[in-house]
């Protein structure tokens, strides 16, 4: 019988810049954007022409706003609406944690829609050049969740070699579900998206990559939810499902719909509108 691993004693603060404490989650966001931007620029140079690299750079500001505002509001609305209704000022305490990917995704979609309208770009074509790099942020974000010792998994067999005891998870060994999500939503989905984006026949079907991302994320997240402990204030829903799985259903349906729509339309050689 193997002994479960003990969660490492990580400092919740990655480093300090003078009086400013930079936490791991904020660092994950910053590193994600630094890594993702040059890759998105490289993808944008591939045919068919969609946007200029300057437009990709400009969109970064809108993407950051979409992720932060959408992620926070999504967490408030999807996971703890009554708590924040009673204490509305708590919404602004982002340093205490509480972000939702589904909310962040909606925020980025709205940012994409506004930016595409403002710059007269094709919404689906431009989105296809952005979404392949999103798994970078997902993977690093889940790594930050692990370092923070949060969003841990369900109880695991003590014989599981990587079963771990988390400081806030009680004395029982658990699945390190944050790392499962980092590997599936991050590494695996990134490989799938970059491979698909490298195929000219895929890039010419505007909307296909966006649909593939939505469907791929929904599948990866739904799978990992079987190992992740549900939020304590929500618990399990009907049939043993979780809120994360419930929110993935419309995402998967939208993804499949986009892929079918893209494949039924003729291939495009230009994205100018």
Curated annotation (Swiss-Prot):
Pfam families: LGT (PF01790). GO terms for cellular component: plasma membrane. It is a multi-pass membrane protein. It is found in: Cell inner membrane. InterPro entries: Lgt (IPR001640). Its main location: membrane. Pathway: Protein modification; lipoprotein biosynthesis (diacylglyceryl transfer). Its EC number is 2.5.1.145. The chain crosses the membrane at residues 20-40, 59-79, 97-117, 206-226, 243-263. A 1,2-diacyl-sn-glycero-3-phospho-(1'-sn-glycerol) binds at residue 142. It is an enzyme of class 2 (transferase). Keywords: Cell inner membrane, Cell membrane, Membrane, Transferase, Transmembrane, Transmembrane helix. Catalyzes the transfer of the diacylglyceryl group from phosphatidylglycerol to the sulfhydryl group of the N-terminal cysteine of a prolipoprotein, the first step in the formation of mature lipoproteins. Belongs to the Lgt family. This is Phosphatidylglycerol--prolipoprotein diacylglyceryl transferase.
């Amino acid at each position: 019988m193997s002994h479960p691993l003990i969660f490492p004693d990580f400092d919740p603060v990655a480093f300090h810049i003078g009086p400013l404490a930079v936490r791991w989650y904020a660092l994950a966001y910053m590193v994600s954007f630094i890594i993702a931007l040059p890759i998105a620029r490289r993808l944008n140079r591939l045919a068919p022409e969609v946007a200029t690299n300057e437009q990709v750079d400009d969109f970064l500001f809108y993407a950051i706003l979409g992720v932060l505002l959408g992620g926070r509001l999504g967490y408030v609305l999807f996971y703890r609406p009554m708590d924040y209704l009673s204490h509305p000022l708590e919404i602004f305490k982002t340093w205490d944690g509480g972000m939702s990917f589904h909310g962040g995704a909606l925020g980025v979609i709205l940012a994409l829609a506004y930016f595409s309208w403002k710059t007269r770009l094709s919404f689906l074509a431009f989105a296809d050049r952005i979404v392949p790099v999103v798994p970078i942020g997902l993977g690093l974000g889940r790594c930050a969740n692990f370092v923070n010792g949060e969003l841990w998994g369900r109880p695991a067999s003590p014989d599981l070699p990587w079963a771990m005891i988390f400081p806030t998870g009680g004395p029982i060994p658990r699945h390190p579900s944050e790392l499962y999500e980092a590997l599936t939503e991050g590494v695996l989905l990134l490989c799938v998206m970059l491979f698909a984006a490298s195929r000219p026949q895929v890039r010419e079907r505007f909307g296909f990559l966006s649909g593939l991302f939505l469907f791929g994320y929904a599948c990866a997240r739904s799978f990992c939810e079987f190992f992740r402990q549900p939020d304590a204030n929500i618990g399990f829903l009907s049939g043993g499902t979780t809120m994360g799985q419930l929110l993935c259903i419309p995402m998967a349906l939208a993804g499949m719909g986009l892929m079918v729509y893209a494949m039924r339309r003729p291939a495009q050689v230009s994205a100018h509108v």
